[in-house]
């Protein structure tokens, strides 16, 4: 279980960190694939990008450093909240092609949070 959780943490940690960075550094040609991103208010745009970066890093760094490992399940729980917001945003706009991805990402984040909170907590110096 520990190895499976680590694989999920690294994959989703990298994914969310990259997606969060894209909120700030938008590559050319992205508008066609992620046009919805341009419709967010600037404040919400930066908040969601920052949350994704911090939570993505929070899935990986505490476990590697063994410092504040309790942050990993909290990062997973935070990503669940971000994905609930994304689900609502896309559903209200009728962008149902994005809703499935939000559900998968939210479910995986919830599993990581539960797994690192109850099933296989990370060992750490913080207890």
What are the residue ranges of the model-derived segments?
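Membrane-interface extramembranous regions
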Residues: 1-127
């Amino acid at each position: 279980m520990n190895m499976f959780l680590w694989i999920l943490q690294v994959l989703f940690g990298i994914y969310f960190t990259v997606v969060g960075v894209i909120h700030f550094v938008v590559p050319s040609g992205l508008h066609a694939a992620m046009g919805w991103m341009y419709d967010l208010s600037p404040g919400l745009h930066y908040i969601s990008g920052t949350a994704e970066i911090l939570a993505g890093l929070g899935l990986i760094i505490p476990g590697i450093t063994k410092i504040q490992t309790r942050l990993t399940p909290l990062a997973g729980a935070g990503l669940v909240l971000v994905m609930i917001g994304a689900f609502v945003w896309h559903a209200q706009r009728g962008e149902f092609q994005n809703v499935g991805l939000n559900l998968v990402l939210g479910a995986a984040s919830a599993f990581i949070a539960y797994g690192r909170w109850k099933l296989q907590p990370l060992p750490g110096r913080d207890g």
